[in-house]
């Protein structure tokens, strides 16, 4: 449920619900406005389109990876001119210190040359004290199988290695190159009926650690597939634990996942088509999942990436609202907090014609930082990545 804070809308459940986390007069929109006013642009001036950032924060620096292009606003896996780039931001001063493209179509590396195609949906992991590992998909829809690659970034020299390495997908049938065909085959063997596509397999909600293991939510956006995976110790193979795509009548994508206080897994899934509202599914073991269903604390979601994090001892659920500001898509984003994953309060409400979409949140030394896609002119508003302090 969402508690009746100022700017919060509905109450579900009984009067015996836990004590409120926020003051009765808390203004979620005012809090969101204050955050947005202090954001800084991390995108280079020549960039026309930028989207889907992820980041890690190490030794006072935010390392932000993003897909970008210098041709037009927006993004598409069918645009071979989309590349992936890294921005380094000092979190104390919010100053952008470095920007570097690390993979693009037909780029020549020491051990391989990338084929023609978009470099898409980058993800970043701190592998050890000296190394960041960055993953991305190389895609050319309807022409070849997409492949997920990775390369390492040395924190001491602040430089990328000049080699690419293939990531792998472990399924019930064995270990394969990380390509959509194997992800689909594993789901199909368990009754998944949507057709296979040759692109769209991404590391989506990443990376989350529980009981000494590292997990990630896998996604095939055009294929409507979702699964929980565990990452091996070498950080090069993703083992599918369980798929959560039911009911088959809904096309569900781009999930975010976390574990509740009793150990139950819970995922929130984006919905394409239908009423476009988010659905939720749970699992006791990460392998067998309940049929997705709507929950009352998300009454009017829109088709966009959700977030589901644990920060400062609370759960944080971020979701795109279907309400539009002056007709702008993805112009309202809610960020709710909870102690138990059931009783929710609205802490931030971001309303802007610049859009507020695909945010990423990271806790570092007692503060929470965010990166988010915004724009001014293109209808998609996928033009730049903003960075700043949430609280």
Give the role of each language-model region:
Residues 1-4:
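Positively charged n-region of N-terminal signal peptides that target proteins for export
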Residues 6-16:
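Bacterial N-terminal signal peptides
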Residues 117-119:
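Elongated alpha-helical scaffolds
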Residues 341, 364-367:
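Hydrophobic alpha-helical segments
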Residues 357-358:
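Active-site pocket scaffolds in enzymes
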């Amino acid at each position: 449920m969402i508690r009746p804070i100022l700017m919060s809308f509905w109450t579900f459940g009984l009067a015996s619900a836990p004590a409120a986390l926020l003051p009765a007069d808390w203004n979620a929109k005012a809090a969101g406005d204050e955050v947005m006013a202090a954001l800084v642009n991390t995108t280079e001036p020549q960039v026309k389109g930028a989207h889907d950032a992820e980041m890690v924060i190490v030794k006072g620096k935010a390392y932000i990876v993003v897909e970008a292009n210098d041709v037009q606003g927006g993004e598409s896996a069918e645009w071979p001119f989309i590349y992936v780039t890294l921005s380094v931001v000092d979190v104390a001063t919010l100053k952008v210190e470095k920007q570097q493209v690390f993979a693009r179509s037909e780029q020549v590396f020491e051990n391989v040359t990338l084929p023609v195609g978009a470099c898409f949906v980058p993800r970043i992991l701190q592998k050890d004290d000296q190394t960041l590992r960055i993953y991305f998909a190389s895609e050319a829809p309807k022409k070849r199988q997409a492949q997920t690659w990775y390369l390492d970034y040395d924190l001491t020299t602040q430089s990328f290695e000049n080699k690419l390495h293939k990531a792998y997908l472990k399924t019930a049938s064995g270990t394969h190159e990380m390509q959509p065909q194997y992800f689909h085959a594993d789901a199909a063997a368990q009754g998944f009926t949507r057709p296979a596509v040759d692109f769209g397999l991404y590391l989506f909600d990443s990376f989350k650690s529980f009981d000494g293991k590292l997990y990630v939510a896998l996604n095939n956006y055009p294929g409507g597939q979702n699964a929980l995976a565990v990452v091996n110790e070498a950080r090069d193979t993703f083992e599918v634990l369980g798929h959560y795509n039911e009911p088959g009548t809904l096309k569900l994508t781009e999930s975010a996942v976390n574990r509740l206080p009793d150990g139950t897994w819970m995922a929130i899934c984006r919905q394409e088509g239908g009423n476009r509202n988010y659905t939720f599914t749970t699992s006791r073991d990460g392998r067998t999942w309940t049929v997705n269903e709507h929950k009352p604390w998300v009454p009017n979601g829109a088709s966009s990436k959700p977030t589901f994090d644990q920060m400062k001892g609370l759960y944080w659920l971020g979701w795109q609202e279907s309400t539009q500001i002056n007709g702008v898509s993805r112009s309202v984003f809610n960020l709710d907090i909870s102690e138990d994953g059931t009783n929710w309060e609205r802490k931030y409400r971001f309303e802007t014609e610049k859009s507020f979409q695909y945010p990423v949140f990271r806790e570092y030394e007692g503060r929470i930082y965010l990166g988010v896609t915004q724009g001014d002119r293109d209808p998609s508003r996928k033009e730049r990545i903003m960075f700043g302090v949430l609280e």
